[in-house]
Amino acid sequence: SLSASEKAAVLSIVGKIGSQGSALGSEALTRLFLSFPQTKTYFPHFDLTPGSADLNTHGGKIINALAGAANHLDDLAGNLSSLSDLHAYNLRVDPGNFPLLAHIIQVVLATHFPGDFTAEVQAAWDKFLALVSAVLTSKYR
C-alpha cells in the first residue's frame, strides 16, 4: 500500500491533470504503440493515428480511471473491480502489457509536469501504477 506522503504525491499530479486527461492518455497510447508495436493487436478497430478520436476517447478513459483509482487509494480492488473483470475475461489483455503502459504514463507525466514530477513523485506513481496493474491482473488464471 501507499504511505500518506506517496498518496499525496499521486494526488498532486492527478490534480494537475484536470481536463487534459484525453490528450495525455492519447499521447500515452501513441507512445505505447510506437515503443511496443505488439500492443496494437488489442485495438484492431481503432484509428491509431496520433490524436485520433479513438485514441483521445480511450486515452481519456485510461487517465480518468487512474484518477478515480487515485481518489480511492484505500480500496483500489473495489474501485477497479469492473475494469479487472473486463481486462481478464473479455479483453484478455496480456498482463505483461500493464507495466509497459505504466512506464509510458510516467514518461508522459514527466514530460508535461517536469517541475512537479520529481523523483519522489515518480517513485510514488511507479508504486501506484504497480498496485493498479496488480488489481487489473488479479482475476487472471
UniProtKB/Swiss-Prot annotation:
Protein family (similarity comment): Belongs to the globin family.
Residues in Globin domain copies: 1-141
Superkingdom as given in the UniProt entry: Eukaryota
MF terms in GO: haptoglobin binding; heme binding; iron ion binding; organic acid binding; oxygen binding; oxygen carrier activity; peroxidase activity
Binding partners and assembly: Heterotetramer of two alpha chains and two beta chains.
Function: This is a tadpole (larval) alpha chain.
BP GO terms, sorted: hydrogen peroxide catabolic process
Keyword terms, alphabetized: Acetylation, Heme, Iron, Metal-binding, Oxygen transport, Transport
Tissue and organ expression note: Red blood cells.
Species in which this protein is naturally found: Aquarana catesbeiana
N-acetylserine carried by residues: S1
Protein's recorded name: Hemoglobin subunit alpha-3
Binding site for heme b: H87
PROSITE patterns for the chain: GLOBIN
Binding site for O2: H58
One GO CC term, this protein: hemoglobin complex
InterPro entries recorded: Globin, Globin-like_sf, Globin/Proto, Hemoglobin_a-typ, Hemoglobin_oxygen_transport, Hemoglobin_pi
